[in-house]
Amino acid sequence: MSPYFKLSSALIFLAITMEALCSPIENTSTSNKDNDKETEHIEISAKPSGISRGALGQGFEIHREDLLSKQFEATGEKIFEDLPMDECTVTTTLGTIERDDSFYNSTESLYQSVASSTKISGSLKGAYTLGVSVAAVTNNIASSEEEVQGLSLNLKAYSMSSILKKNCVNTKPLSKDLVSDFEALDSEITKPWKLSSWKKYKVLLEKYGSRIVKESISGSSIYQYVFAKSSQKFNHRSFTVKACVSLAGPTKVGKLSFSGCTGVSQQEIEQSSSQSMIKKLVVRGGKTETRASLIGELDPDQINKFLIEAETDPSPIQYKFEPIWTILKTRYVGTEHFAKAVNLEQFYKGFLHFGCSYLHTTSAENKVAEMQKFDFAKTSDPDAPTYVCKVGPEGCQHHEDCHYRAAFWCECGGPYDLARTCFRHKFKKLKSGLTKKECYPNKESGFAWHGCRLHGLTCWCSAPNRSWEESWSGEDTNNALNDVHQVLMEKKRRDNAQQQY
């Protein structure tokens, strides 16, 4: 065994261990739960199977998938050439029924709930990655500018959990097509702000997905969702009553085995009938034919019978994912292809998810001024590139941005400005709860100076600000593997240099 192989193996093991120890623990309390969880033990007689494992090991482009409102089918892309499930999975029998509710006090809390339950990083809980899922369960009201609130009644019968062994994920042969397509990517991106520069990367994501299913939880589950615009000002109790009545109907709501529904009064039922909310019933797991029969208002006996199917006929009710670039970075650390895995990660997180597309405006005299661009960080290393999202400098860009105003001062832009290239910055709060710095042409009065200088009774852009500001940085995505990679590449260069003498 070569010294290089021993060193690289030791460093990779150390890096993976350090990442596991140092990764931030994300808050898994994704919604406000006022009701205690009710649990019940069940005996699981089912054995692990292809049906119970579902899409385990398959790749999906998550931003196109509905992770909430329907059964998630095992139709993903092949990522591994050979992945023997009996050898490569750890299956744990669960055997519990849980009944609880989740209150979503904002759109942000709904995004956080989806991100936590699927093991998708909190930094990716926004509209690009999870917007399809949130829109599906709220009938698109959460995709508008409106804030939403809501609640779900959660009835979950857990049969078993099947998770891929890390050793198999890191060592089993990848699909030959994936290897071929990945290694054919460009290592160096010459103009990273242009989407066309990333064409091959985008095609790879569309074909193989941004994530693989790392864990499959099987059983049977029923979720009754209700949502409304926050401006309608419904309280928690109103959502609870609406969900209970929607699930079982007004005459059988008290028969539900659910503490939150047992005390619903006739007055509350009548009041709820006049309250307009979005309702969505989601049935997952169990038998296909049983799922198909559970529509509309459900009889409590139907519900209990379906939940018990987790004992004998479980199918997936929840998936947890792992980024495909994490797998690729581990496989290709210390090689010339590692930069491609880093590129893939930062292109997805910064360009696509954060929304750092190239933005510019043109002045009345056809002069172009850039407002936003995805570019290399000043400290970027070709072996492990780092990118940033930059917003254009505040203030004037051209002389046409500056306008003389009485009392001897200069205004930059303004309501009557035709140049459209005097920039200002603002912080926009996203539905995910994060904030994003944006650059826009100033159309408001009173934006004084900002690079404009008075020359007699004329104003010129004599002192423009040339400093771009960062709104997103890929340095946050750097991890121990990047450091290991740089050590290995430096050792390779030294060894090659010595061999030439």
Curated annotation (Swiss-Prot):
Signal peptide per UniProt: 1-22
Coiled-coil stretches noted in the UniProt entry, renumbered to this chain: 135-159
Covalent S-S links between cysteines: C389-C402, C396-C410, C412-C422
Keyword terms: Coiled coil, Cytolysis, Disulfide bond, EGF-like domain, Hemolysis, Nematocyst, Secreted, Signal, Toxin
All copies of domain EGF-like, residue ranges: 388-422
Domain of life from the UniProt record: Eukaryota
Cytoplasm recorded as keyword: no
BP-aspect Gene Ontology terms: killing of cells of another organism
GO molecular function: toxin activity
Protein name, UniProt field: DELTA-alicitoxin-Pse2a
Naturally occurring in which organism (per UniProt): Phyllodiscus semoni
Chain ranges of the MACPF domain: 23-359
Function: Causes lethal toxicity to the shrimp Palaemon paucidence, and hemolytic activity toward sheep red blood cells.
Subcellular location: Secreted; Nematocyst
Record propeptide residues: 23-35
InterPro entries: MACPF
GO CC annotations, alphabetized: extracellular region; nematocyst
